[in-house]
Amino acid sequence: MRKRKVAIIGSGNIGTDLMIKILRHGQHLEMAVMVGIDPQSDGLARARRLGVATTHEGVGGLMQMAEFADIDFVFDATSAGAHIKNDAALREAKPGIRVIDLTPAAIGPYCVPVVNLADNLHQGNVNMVTCGGQATIPMVAAVSRVAKVHYAEIVASIASQSAGPGTRANIDEFTETTSQAIEKVGGAGKGKAIIVLNPAEPPLMMRDTVYILSELASQEAIAASIAEMAAAVQAYVPGYRLKQQVQFEVIPEDRPVNLPGVGCFSGLKTAVYLEVEGAAHYLPAYAGNLDIMTSAALATAEQMAGAMHSAAGATA
């Protein structure tokens, strides 16, 4: 079976970790080119040491390379603004190319593998939301498939050391993109996202808190749905886990809570507490926020490539 060749744009933390994952674990994918803009970057130097072709001239440099003719997938780990330009350039040069967007740009549909990848296998561009979205949206969706979710709020706490310049430059986009995806993918009527950069030393692992307000439903059914969804995420992010038991609170009709922008609410409040430990392929174990993004992106592209192979076999 022919592996699909891959280029990664962005030689920072996320791009480098993703490269190492593909080199070690790629089933349908083969690492071909690492693209950066800083000739002195550690990511480009590491790629060269690992035998991967590189360019420090951005997406323009990639398109000038002989290897570009064989590239089927491009992962973009730059920034929201850069991705818009990168996608346009790639699409003009190669209309059928598959682009996996790890920025908050969201040109294509939001993709959270365990929730909606099957609906997006044939998209030309998919957006991996954010680290907080990849960790928490599965929990919102787990409740949503049992009961109607009116409101979901997530708080993602990540180690300050794991937040590179791209993450820091995209804080506003993080909250906006995650909030929208909580609604569109998670199924919540209204979503809200908060990110906290924790400066603690030694750095703490990624922690996520998810508050979900839904119609009254069986607490046992919701807890079972959450456990099942957590196991599905663990299939591609082994360090993903429930930190403690799911907590429930019934909010009675005669004592509703008032949510600004949503209104008065009564029903069931579900609280989910998560921890994400990184696989430490390139990044430290505390950087679970970056690991879950690269793991989700790899799982998405692998399944897309597998579907392409199956389709090619069916028409052969």
Swiss-Prot record:
GO annotation (BP), single: 3-phenylpropionate catabolic process
UniProt keywords, alphabetically: Aromatic hydrocarbons catabolism, NAD, Oxidoreductase
Enzyme class, spelled out: oxidoreductase
Source taxon at top rank: Bacteria
Binding residues annotated for NAD(+), in chain numbering: 11-14, 162-170, 289
CDD domains reported in the protein's UniProt record: ALDH_C
Metabolic or biological pathway: Aromatic compound metabolism; 3-phenylpropanoate degradation
EC number(s) recorded for this UniProt protein: 1.2.1.10
Entry GO MF terms: acetaldehyde dehydrogenase (acetylating) activity; NAD binding
Subunit structure: Interacts with MhpE.
HAMAP family in the cross-refs: Ac_ald_DH_ac
Protein family according to the UniProt entry: Belongs to the acetaldehyde dehydrogenase family.
Job description of the protein: Catalyzes the conversion of acetaldehyde to acetyl-CoA, using NAD(+) and coenzyme A. Is the final enzyme in the meta-cleavage pathway for the degradation of aromatic compounds.
Protein's name in the database: Acetaldehyde dehydrogenase
Lineage: Bacteria, Pseudomonadati, Pseudomonadota, Gammaproteobacteria, Enterobacterales
